[in-house]
């Protein structure tokens, strides 16, 4: 019979990064300075793609051209419609032995402008918005907001708009009802207290001088936009303007162990995946990092992972080296990098503690996602889970495994199933997030760093 101590050694232990690798904390802090810069510069998918392209160019990546000659060690990249990033390092082995894919998304929940957004009502001018992704509407009023986007003007030129990020810029906001008049609102269920039609962004209150004109405040705002950017009301029809929180990424906690920011979902996985791809040199397998769009709304469309753009890129890589893409896909492995919920002690009733993932305990694996009875998920094979855990153990990565929360409370999906549907072995992995999908999400720096070390080990692995 084994002793008590010997039996305890059989248990699954889920210790913090600080307990297991105290020296890694300083490394995590240093790594996350670059991540915070990425967050502040990349609040939209277009900005994330542009920032990533700068990093790739600085690292010596060349634009990919179908049919170009590719040799081991070459680094190539492609930008899809200004919203997706595809970067590859050609491996020493044939692509017939498979790719190592790190895939994350760079869109985040937000508010978009409607096609005809500008209106005036009772002394104020507003933008009407259409929420994008799974937001909790009550979280968006009474915080500073910024405008980011592009406008394709009627003359064919394109102008970029960013207002609200610099200290000298004006901010924007959405109002809420004062508590003194909130008795009826307080009786409503939480999702109904603030509706989609309440999410109107305040733009201004000064009218033009002509007292006889209609919509004097709307005209005043439109005149300012025309002076600043040369746009008309018609140009909003051909614009993509996003309303995002104006917060900067900030250290959270007296110990500065966490980061609070907008857009951790999923840039907290995208940045480490990209950095691992950039840093790999002469890998055994061809490595590919894909940062995709539209995950928050189902991954459809020409920039979503459910389209063919990413797989066409992989097929073109295969064609350039004379490899059958079907064989390459079947031999490939993919880490689908997306966030999961961090166990929140303030809302412990929503979680199952033994299967929760915790801030500060390392990068999280989740064998499956989905809702209820594992609907709409890619359930990774045990062999793939074993491969990944052995890889992380070999490379000193602190990791944990779990589920999002209590069953039948809800659920969530990732892009893993779209990759797996192309006959590529895929598993979900990511950083646990507190207050996910809120305007100010919180993550542990140690977990971000362990995600990076996982992606780095995966890029370099020869198995």
Residue ranges and their predicted role:
Residues 1-463:
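N-terminal hydrophobic/helix-forming segments and targeting peptides
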